Amino acid sequence: MKSLDIPKQFINVDGKPIIIRTLENFASHPDVDDIVISCLADKIEYMWQLIGQYKVSKVTSIVPGGENGHGSIHNGLVEVQKFSDPGDIVLICDGVRPLISQSLISDCIETATKYETAVPVTPSIDSVLQSEDGETCCKSLPRKQMYITQAPQGYTMRKIMHAHNEAERLGITNPISSSELLIELGETVHIFKGERDNIKVTTPEDLRFLRSRYYYKSFKNFAKEELKYGL
């Protein structure tokens, strides 16, 4: 999804680009020490300008993205590896999740610290059908066993770098997510409760939902001021 030919992470919502709102959630968390951004190569200078403009703290570096999501994550991890230890926790997140809560970040860190892997999920509320041709369905999957993955996903540097090294060795070039990569490599991935509001802004409907959330928040704040001053 693009708006006026702008990459979706740079779309302005209630006065700030989506990616800035996403970054602020991590920058304000007391257990997050450093932030590394993997960004479109031709947007790196612009990204630094935004970070300065909105005074986002803890951003230590911005690296060029890869040919796909997996490549972008890999480039970011290589940068993080320069100043981290194998047991350190790294949180991997899309730049278009501006509604991440502080408690979700805390739960991710806690789960990854305990199990080395942490993936937030929400139970599927709809029935899930499997189709091989996109026209007919051959299997109904048990809804009670179906979960929708979210981000941030947390891993020890040891665990996620090993997965990326194995992917390179085996020629795995474009897994959908880090959790999918680990599962494909035979690893067990630990899940924890995610949040339904933690949307990945992908469609025009997502953008409308996001804007309505900030509009409602602004309206509530205005109403409080009216009551405070008796307007």
Give short role names for the model-derived ranges.
Residues 146-231:
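Conserved alpha/beta core of the MobA/IspD/sugar-nucleotide pyrophosphorylase nucleotidyltransferase superfamily
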Residues 55-70:
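Conserved donor nucleotide-binding strand/loop of the catalytic core
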Residues 1-45:
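N-terminal glycine-rich phosphate-binding loop and ensuing alpha1 helix
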Residues 67-134, 150:
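Conserved beta-loop-beta/alpha segment of the NTase-like Rossmann-fold superfamily
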